[in-house]
A protein has these predicted regions:
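Catalytic cores of nucleotide-sugar-dependent glycosyltransferases that transfer UDP/GDP/TDP-activated
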Residues: 1-220
């Protein structure tokens, strides 16, 4: 509810555009306050990409044809918003396939940024993954800031797009988000060397386990 949570546009950040495949898309940043908590939540918006009745699939359950573009827009938009605010942070925690490009971008396109190159990156994979509906054209769309499609090789396997496995290759820590993961993802995690992994944690234990994991990772 926009009125209840006082959701409104951050006007001073308006005017930013995200380029995808040579097309410009305006990035609208909104903020809301959670009742009873001293916490603000920021939202990235674009009417063409996100003003829909369903999130990732249409009413027949078919993934939207522009999910590739929406993902690139979201991932780059998150990073550019952090840069715009100048937020220093100890870590950034990315959840699911929709954020899979963020660890990659932070370790490549933005690796020399003085604000972003100090983050510890944590990635949480889930069972849900729509990589199978992505096309090789995704590599061109995701090649931002002088990156080349070849730089995204970790996101390809046997000519198929593998979003989650790609993200895992650029993370500093992993927290499993589902009790059951795809076998290929489980194998990819086991192959990683020196990356701390927190197995799936039930909701009632999540706060304690996650904080311990965060603190241990930051101290390393």
């Amino acid at each position: 509810n926009e009125r209840r949570h006082r959701l409104h546009e951050v006007v001073r950040l308006s005017g930013m555009n995200i380029i995808i495949d040579d097309d410009d898309y305006p990035l609208i940043i909104k903020v809301a306050s959670l009742p009873g908590m001293r916490l603000q939540v920021y939202f990235l918006d674009n009417e063409e990409f996100f003003k829909r009745k369903f999130m990732f699939h249409d009413e027949e359950g078919k993934p939207f044809a522009d999910n590739e573009d929406r993902m690139v827009f979201f991932c780059k938009g998150v990073i550019e918003t952090i840069r715009k605010f100048g937020w220093p942070a100890d870590y950034i925690h990315c959840f699911g396939w929709m954020t899979a490009l963020i660890p990659f971008y932070l370790k490549t396109a933005y690796k020399n940024d003085p604000i972003l190159n100090k983050f510890k990156i944590i990635y949480t994979p889930y069972k849900e993954d729509i990589s199978g509906f992505f096309t090789p054209k995704f590599l061109d769309k995701a090649s931002i800031n002088n990156l080349e499609p070849e730089d995204l090789k970790p996101f390809m396997k046997n000519k198929d797009v593998t979003l989650i496995e790609g993200a895992l290759a650029f993370t500093d820590g992993i927290i499993i988000g589902s009790e059951d993961l795809d076998e290929s993802v489980t194998k990819a995690i086991k192959k990683l060397k020196g990356i701390p992994v927190l197995d799936y944690v039930p909701l009632e234990n999540m706060k304690k386990e996650y904080m311990e994991f965060y603190n241990k990772l930051i101290e390393e």
